[in-house]
């Protein structure tokens, strides 16, 4: 990442500033120079804030970055253009703020652009997604950016002096090693889950084994007595258990099948006897019902005769009904003809009345034409009538307002002259404020040094007292330790190993006699008495253990005290008593008060002058605004006069209200005349159309009447022919037959029902006679008793078989589950053994007592130190090398850095280095860190680096060496920028970015020495 252009608005001391980094030729080394507080570090803050929304140092919050002199209505913003991998990007970030006059905060904004074909195209326009885009683009977050690109003031030696836990946090962020810690936790949880699953499987096997049914069988009970932890024995017994269960099931099944066959035989015999009994009863009943049905035969024959006559007269009845319909149509047609003739007469009367109205309307035509002409000529005036009416209303107001504006303008001019006289030749003196501020700062620094020295001396006395007390304790404990060691050496340790052999010797003595051969040494036994005092041996052994425990406790205490003394020595070496002023605190406080009073007086004077200038600017602005309003008033007055003249010329009216009333009246008269004329024409057209329709209807009705008369004549002829065919003489005969038609459906149903039942009886009697022929009926009660007996026996055996079958199948399922659990358990124990071992190694239970994450971080730290030593050797004239402290204690140590002094051939604590040596080591380590991170990340492009302060602690020769190191970075294609107050750097570095301040804002410019 290489900076190209930086634009700052209301950022720190920069109200509106631009820095063009393209003026730096060929990645030239350049110096950022300026007075204390001028805003040099703010340049780094601006670049970091533009990219990540944070300052270059963690101590600065976003609210601290906004300029105190910024306009309350203007936001703080930074625009940063940079080059990355031969592509150009621009970011614009606006900070959140509460706009003057508002109570709610204006939200932050962030836009990311990329240059494509010479133009910037937007890539992101939201704060969160845009910041994530930048992190992915650069390959680093804000913390990593501070470590790689910007080495902030007071922070870039932090990595050198930090302890293992602090380095772990830094390296974890840079190399994303948290994933290794996550792996350890995952493995830990996985092992925990696996062990729980294994225990659960043992419980499931035991539960299944206890639930297996024994059928009260001695063989199965014997097989089930095996303990479930003996999984191999379970595997052997399961086939035997299944085979015995099948034998029990087969025996029960054989008894069940025999009972089912016996029941089926008696069930079939009972069913056949019941069917035969029902058929005999049904046959007797059907024969009786059939005799009763035959008695209805004469009545059915009479019904059939009536139905035949009704069928023959159907055509005649249809002709009679048709005659009535035709006569009705003829009567309706005559009525329609009469109504239509009356409608035609009424329409002719209406037309004559409308013709009279039309003639009266045409007599007013000339007057209407004159009104139309007036409307056409003045329509444009009426459409914009408000404009002309407003001109009449505004003209007097505008005259009065113009006179008032002229008077106010004269008063403002006089006020401006008064303010200019008050200012006179007075000017703000900010240089004096700067001088007083510097003096006050120096006095405060001297006061703080005196107070810090007093505090440091008190702390030093306290630490020296603690150290002396610890040394006295060590001497006292060392003396006690020597006495205990002397006492321990005096003890006789022989035969102590026989203390636990007393029972063994007693057993041997009880098994042998005097004169026997000893089973231990092979010699003849002369005596069986007691030769060893076991009580004395045990007492001596307890005393030795007590002394050894005391020695161990004292050694532990001495080690703790030595560690505490080492810690106190480190704190003593870190106490720094600075050179202080010769003046007393009383004198310094008096001088401080005098300078603060002088500063306040000068600030009050500057504030008064600035207020007068602000009032002058305000009056100038008011005069300008008044002049604009006066010009606007004159323009509006002229426009009103022109509009009034135009209205009176065209309308011949000098009153807007009269014109509006007459115009609307004329428009109303014209509209009424036109609407009435159109209405008359529409009525005439409608009357003509209606008369034509009624004439057509009349012709249609007359044609219909003629057709109906012809149909009636033909229908009468058909009636006469049909009566002749049926031998009917008059209408009375026809009426009698017609009376039967109401009963026709009932008669037909009665006839059909009789025939259907007659046929059914014949069929059913024949069927039942065939079923009962040559068959004997048995005793039903005896059959029922035998049926119930066989059924009860069968159901009992079926229930027994179902229960045994279910239990056998359940046993099979349980044994299969047990086998499955055992197989899975064996395989699981085999598969998870490697995971158990891996989890212990990753958790630090290994020969180095290191967790996986710390092992990886130590590897990266070794790479960083090796890279840093290449530069440190040059800067320290081959005296110093950084080394990693090898002490390791279960995972969280091993990351401390010491320095190896080649002159003394010994390693030293990093705090023993001088300020200049510490700067050399910090710079070398920071450069090594950035290069290793770049190598590991791959996607990070380090084309620039910026360093803030630190060179003031170096002597001339070391300063030259450090500069040569930074110049070598330039040769690798990296832009290097340095912030420093060291004057020698201005002579060595030709290009300087100078930062100047006038106490309320700063500016920058590049210059060459």
Swiss-Prot record:
Disulfide bonds: none annotated. InterPro entries: P-loop_NTPase, Rad50/SbcC_AAA, SbcCD_Nuclease_C. Induction: Induced by ciprofloxacin or mitomycin C in subinhibitory concentration. Heterodimer of SbcC and SbcD. Residues 176-364, 392-502, 535-802 form a coiled coil. GO terms for biological process: DNA recombination; DNA replication; double-strand break repair; SOS response. This is Nuclease SbcCD subunit C. It comes from Staphylococcus aureus (strain Newman).
């Amino acid at each position: 990442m290489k900076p190209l252009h930086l634009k700052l608005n209301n950022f720190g001391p920069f109200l509106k500033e631009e820095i063009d980094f393209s003026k730096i030729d060929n990645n030239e080394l350049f110096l950022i120079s300026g007075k204390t507080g001028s805003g040099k570090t703010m340049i780094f803050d601006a670049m970091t804030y533009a990219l990540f929304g944070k300052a270059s140092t963690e101590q600065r919050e976003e609210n601290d970055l906004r300029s105190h002199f910024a306009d309350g209505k203007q936001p703080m913003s930074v625009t940063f253009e940079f080059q990355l991998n031969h592509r150009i990007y621009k970011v614009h970030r606006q900070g959140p703020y509460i706009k003057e006059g508002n109570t709610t905060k204006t939200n932050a904004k962030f836009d990311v652009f990329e240059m494509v074909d010479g133009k910037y195209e937007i890539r992101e326009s939201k704060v969160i997604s845009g910041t994530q885009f930048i992190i992915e683009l650069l390959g680093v977050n804000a913390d990593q950016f501070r470590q790689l690109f910007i080495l902030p003031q007071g922070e870039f030696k932090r990595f050198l002096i930090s302890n293992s836990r602090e380095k772990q946090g830094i390296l974890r962020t840079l190399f994303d090693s948290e994933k290794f810690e996550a792996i350890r936790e995952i493995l830990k949880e996985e092992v925990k889950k696996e062990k729980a699953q294994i225990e659960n499987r043992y419980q499931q096997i035991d539960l299944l084994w206890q639930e297996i049914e024994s059928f009260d069988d001695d063989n199965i009970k014997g097989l089930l007595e095996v303990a479930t932890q003996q999984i191999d024995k379970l595997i052997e017994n399961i086939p035997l258990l299944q085979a015995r269960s099948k034998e029990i099931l087969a025996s029960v099944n054989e008894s069940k099948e025999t009972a089912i066959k016996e029941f089926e035989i008696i069930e079939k015999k009972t069913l056949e006897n019941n069917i035969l009994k029902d058929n005999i009863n049904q046959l007797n009943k059907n024969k009786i019902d059939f005799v009763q049905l035959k008695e209805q035969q004469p009545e059915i024959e009479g019904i059939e005769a009536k139905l035949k006559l009704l069928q023959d007269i159907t055509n005649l009845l249809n002709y009679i009904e048709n005659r009535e319909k035709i006569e009705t149509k003829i009567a309706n047609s005559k009525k329609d003809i009469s109504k239509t003739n009356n409608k035609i007469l009424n329409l002719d009367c209406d037309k004559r009345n409308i013709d009279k109205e039309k003639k009266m309307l045409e007599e007013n035509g000339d007057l209407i034409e004159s009104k139309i002409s007036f409307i056409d000529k003045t329509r444009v005036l009426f459409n914009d009538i408000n404009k002309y009416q407003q001109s009449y209303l505004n003209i007097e107001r505008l005259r009065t307002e113009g006179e008032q504006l002229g008077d106010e303008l004269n008063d403002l001019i006089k006020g401006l002259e008064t303010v200019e006289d008050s200012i006179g030749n007075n000017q703000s003196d900010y240089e004096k404020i700067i001088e007083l501020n510097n003096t006050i700062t120096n006095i405060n620094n001297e006061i703080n040094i005196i107070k810090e020295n007093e505090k440091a001396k008190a702390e030093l006395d306290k630490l020296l007292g603690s150290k002396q007390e610890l040394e006295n304790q060590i001497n006292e404990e060392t003396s006690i330790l020597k006495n205990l060691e002397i006492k321990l050496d005096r003890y006789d340790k022989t035969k102590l190993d026989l203390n636990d052999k007393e029972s063994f010797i007693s057993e041997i003595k009880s098994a042998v006699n005097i004169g026997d051969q000893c089973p231990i040494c092979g010699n003849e036994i002369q005596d069986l008495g007691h030769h060893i005092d076991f009580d004395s041996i045990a007492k001596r052994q307890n005393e030795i253990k007590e002394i050894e425990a005391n020695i161990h406790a004292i050694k532990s205490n001495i080690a703790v005290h030595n560690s505490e003394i080492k810690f106190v020595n480190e704190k003593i070496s870190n106490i720094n008593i600075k050179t202080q002023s010769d003046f007393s605190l009383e004198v310094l406080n008096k001088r401080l008060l005098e300078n603060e009073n002088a500063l306040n007086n000068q600030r009050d004077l500057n504030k008064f002058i600035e207020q007068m200038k602000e009032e002058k600017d305000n009056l100038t602005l008011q005069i300008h605004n008044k002049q604009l309003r006066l010009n606007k008033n004159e323009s509006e007055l002229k426009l009103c006069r022109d509009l009034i003249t135009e209205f009176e010329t065209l309308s011949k009216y000098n009153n807007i209200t009269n014109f509006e009333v007459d115009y609307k009246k004329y428009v109303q008269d014209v509209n009424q005349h036109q609407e009435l004329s159109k209405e008359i024409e529409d009525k005439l057209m409608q009357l003509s159309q209606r008369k034509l329709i009624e004439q057509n209807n009349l012709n249609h009705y007359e044609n219909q009447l003629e057709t109906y008369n012809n149909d009636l004549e033909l229908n009468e002829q058909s009636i006469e022919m049909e009566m002749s065919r049926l031998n009917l003489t008059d209408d009375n005969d026809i009426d009698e037959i017609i009376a039967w038609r109401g009963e026709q459906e009932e008669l037909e149903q009665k006839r059909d029902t009789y025939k259907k039942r007659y046929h059914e009886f014949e069929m059913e009697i024949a069927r039942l006679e065939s079923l009962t022929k040559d068959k004997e009926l048995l005793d039903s009660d005896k059959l029922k008793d035998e049926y119930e007996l066989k059924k009860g026996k069968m159901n009992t055996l079926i229930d027994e078989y179902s229960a045994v079958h279910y239990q056998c199948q359940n046993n099979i399922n349980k044994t299969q589950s047990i086998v499955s659990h055992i197989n899975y358990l064996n395989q699981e124990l085999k598969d998870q053994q490697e995971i158990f071992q891996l989890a212990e190694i990753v958790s630090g239970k290994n020969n180095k007592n290191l967790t996986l994450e710390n092992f990886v971080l130590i590897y990266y730290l070794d790479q960083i130190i090796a890279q840093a030593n290449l530069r440190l050797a040059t800067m320290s004239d081959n005296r110093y090398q950084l080394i990693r402290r090898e002490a390791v204690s279960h995972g969280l140590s091993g990351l401390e850095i010491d320095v190896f002094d080649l002159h003394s051939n010994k390693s030293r604590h990093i705090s023993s280095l001088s300020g200049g040596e510490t700067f050399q080591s910090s710079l070398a380590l920071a450069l090594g860190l950035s290069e290793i991170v770049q190598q590991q990340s791959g996607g990070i492009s380090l084309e620039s680096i910026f360093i803030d302060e630190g060179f003031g602690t170096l002597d001339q020769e070391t300063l030259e060496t450090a500069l040569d190191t930074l110049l070598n970075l330039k040769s690798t294609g990296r832009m290097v920028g340095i912030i420093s107050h060291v004057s020698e750097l201005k002579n060595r570095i030709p290009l300087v970015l100078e930062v100047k301040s006038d106490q309320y804002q700063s500016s920058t410019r590049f210059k060459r020495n």
